[in-house]
Amino acid sequence: MLDTLRKRLRSEKGFTLIELLVVMIILAILMAIAIPSYLSFRDRANRSAAGADLRAVIPDVEAWFSDHGTYAGMTPALLKASYDQSINTTMYTITSLSATTYCVQATSPNDTTKTAAKKGPSAQIVIGATCP
């Protein structure tokens, strides 16, 4: 009888419920580590893309000023920005427009906002400035 039981156990193939549960627990632990890392990586990439797009828009803003002699009347749609339009995830807002000042805000999909402002005709462009 014992020999019959041993032969039967050897002939049965497959995984036990415990083995399957152990594999599922290991996969859950790996996913618990990987998913937050991936989301963090994606957020950093979006912030970096927003900053790069903002730096690409600034020459177009200055070109507008060269052509028109003022920043007034400028809109994001009128700019010929060379930012990455294949992704097109960054939204731009232009505020505080006057003849000599502007503030451009680039907002990434995770609501990270990067700003660049020029406050005066001979002022430097400040990235990270606060917009009024």
What residues fall within each predicted segment?
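N-terminal leader/signal peptides at the extreme start of proteins
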Residues: M1-F15
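Aliphatic-rich helix starts adjacent to a transmembrane/signal segment
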Residues: R8, S37-L54
